[in-house]
Amino acid sequence: MAKRKVARKRDKKNIPSGVAHIQATFNNTIVTITDPSGAVVSWSSAGVVGFKGSRKSTPFAAQLAAEDAAKKAMEHGMRNVEVYVKGPGSGRESALRALQGAGLNVVMLRDVTPVPHNGCRPRKRRRV
């Protein structure tokens, strides 16, 4: 008889404020919520919420991912977040609005999109 795997329930930490990182790429949107020191409290992405393929890059998918991450973070007692947005994707604004709509108070908003000072050669232009 095989041993039964016991799923250990995550302990509820009391974290009143944290940092929300929204990474919006052209293909997906990933929302990670951490405590002020950087330890991950909750995370979600458009793929985790149930979207596949090109539907992951939609604003609606980003909205659901942000709501999912916010709900998980609020279970740990989080109320206030600083938001760092990275990337050029279509889910930037909708993910931010979803965090506010889920009940998190946005204290600060900062764009941390990396801009090269003429670093690596970019990928070739798409011709459609």
From Swiss-Prot:
Top-level division of the source organism's lineage: Bacteria
Keywords: Ribonucleoprotein, Ribosomal protein, RNA-binding, rRNA-binding
Alphabetical list of Pfam families matching this protein: Ribosomal_S11 (PF00411)
Gene Ontology biological-process entries: translation
PROSITE patterns from the UniProt entry: RIBOSOMAL_S11
Entry keyword Ribosomal protein: yes
Gene3D superfamilies: Ribosomal protein S11
GO molecular function: rRNA binding; structural constituent of ribosome
Function statement: Located on the platform of the 30S subunit, it bridges several disparate RNA helices of the 16S rRNA. Forms part of the Shine-Dalgarno cleft in the 70S ribosome.
UniProt family annotation: Belongs to the universal ribosomal protein uS11 family.
Quaternary structure, from the entry: Part of the 30S ribosomal subunit. Interacts with proteins S7 and S18. Binds to IF-3.
Name listed for the protein in its UniProt record: Small ribosomal subunit protein uS11
Species: Desulfatibacillum aliphaticivorans
